[in-house]
Amino acid sequence: MRLTELLNTENVTISCELFPPKQGAQLDNYKKIVGDMAALKPAYMSVTYGATGGTSDYTVELANEVRNVNHIPALAHLTCASSTKEKVASVIQELKEKQIENVLALRGDIPQNADFPLPNQYKHASELIYDIKSQGDFCIGGACYPEGHPESQTLEEDLIHLKEKVDAGCEFLT
């Protein structure tokens, strides 16, 4: 189910957010936790994405567990600050294969570690949203900052970037 269908009702929705494990050995335990949380019947469950790749390998797998095993709508986070376009395309393909249609597209934090190589292929989340939209029929969410993004010089600049997200295909903001 597309998240916009859930969010466009007058019902109050409660969701859960999962942080994937850093090591694959913990994955089975996390899948059990997903089942336990699904028993609470949240409207949807979101699965975060490790900005520096620390936990990103298990985002799609846990989102699959949410959607296809526990039958709860899944919202997979996808960040691009430290990703290549090829990596993003690969994740998008995995999401399509698992029929995970809800994606929260985020630029993500820029790693402060000078040893971490940054591909610098995405400057803004709007570019990621455009790539996701062009590669499939996804329900895409984006982040907004009522107080203004810390990197924006003005609220007007922040609103311009917010409009760019919507123009690129963002369907809901959080």
Where on the chain are the PLM-derived regions?
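Active-site mouth loops of central-metabolism enzymes
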Residues: T13-N29, A74-E86, G141-E157
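Alpha-helix-loop-beta-strand connector modules within alpha/beta enzyme cores
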Residues: G53-H77, N120-A143
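Glycine-rich, proline-tolerant flexible connector loops at the mouths of alpha/beta enzymes
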Residues: K41-L62, D109-N120, C170-T174
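Glycine-rich anion/phosphate-binding loops
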Residues: C80-E94, P119-K123
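Conserved anion-binding
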Residues: N102-E151, L155-E157
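Conserved, mostly hydrophobic/aromatic
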Residues: E17, M45, L95, K165, ...
